[in-house]
A protein has these predicted regions:
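Active-site metal-binding loops of divalent metal-dependent hydrolases
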Residues: 10, 106-108
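Catalytic-core segments of class I nucleotidyltransferases/pyrophosphorylases
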Residues: 46, 102, 109, 113-126, ...
Length: 246
């Protein structure tokens, strides 16, 4: 199975920290945020990883190299201009293959085990599905949530619990068939269409999740990781935004 880490954002809310350093290389708990993702993926047996980048992307490649230092096989998908989430994934499809793949937003921190992606990918194939999303309880920053999750795991426009998309999902390449490579495109409209077709499912994660989208949350996560108060399981409180709108 292959994975993609989304790392092309400018990091406007992180300025001035991101004026000279790309957001994925900001350090938390003694290492760059993106390295936490790489290590967790490799530990789950997912070593083939594609990373997209735009702003200061050459620094990401210089810092991570080919991934051998982490036991990974890294490949890069540079974007001359940021293509947004769906546009970036569509451009990287030739490197991701024809099977369902895992996508992780580079600016979230979560204790979810990526090894669970194998089962979700198999379920997508078996049901001819297009998307599986990891969902979390709505944080105070995004109380309205994103999508409704029914008891049978189906994502729906109404009914069930309305939860927040965690920025982690398994996708079938067919979801992006209508996106022209090199064209900016948002992910949320594609997910809404998949939900309407009945090809999107999800699961609620009741563990730790944090959107590392502001300097304050970065500092809080760094302090907790460095202090050993959350280790591999995450911070005591989740904090987030509407990651499906990226």
């Amino acid at each position: 199975m292959r994975a993609m880490i989304l790392a092309a954002g400018r990091g406007e809310r992180m300025r001035p920290l991101t004026d000279t350093l790309p957001k994925p290389l900001l350090r938390v708990g003694g290492q760059p945020l993106i390295v936490w993702h790489i290590r967790r993926l490799v530990a789950a047996g997912i070593a083939d990883i594609v990373i997209n980048h735009a702003w200061l992307g050459e620094r990401i490649e210089a810092a991570l190299g080919d991934g051998a230092a982490f036991g990974a096989r890294l490949r890069y998908s540079p974007e001359p201009r940021a293509l947004e989430t769906a546009g970036g994934i569509a451009q990287a499809l030739p490197q991701l293959g024809d099977a369902p793949f895992l996508v992780v937003n580079g600016d979230v921190w979560c204790d979810w085990d990526p090894a669970q992606a194998y089962a979700q990918a198999g379920a997508l194939d078996a049901a001819r599905g297009q998307a599986w999303l990891l969902m979390v309880d709505n944080p105070e920053h995004h109380p309205q949530g994103d999508f409704h999750l029914l008891e049978n795991g189906v994502l729906a426009a109404t009914g069930g619990r309305r939860l927040t998309y965690a920025g982690i999902g398994v996708y079938h390449p067919s979801l992006f068939a209508g996106v022209q490579p090199g064209t900016p495109a948002r992910l949320a409209p594609l997910l809404v269409e998949a939900i309407a077709r009945g090809t999107a499912r999800g699961s609620r994660h009741d563990g730790r999740w944090v959107d590392v989208g502001t300097p304050q949350r970065l500092a809080e996560l760094d302090a907790m990781l460095a202090g050993g108060t959350i280790g591999a399981t995450g911070p005591g409180e989740s904090a987030g935004r509407n990651t499906s709108e990226s």
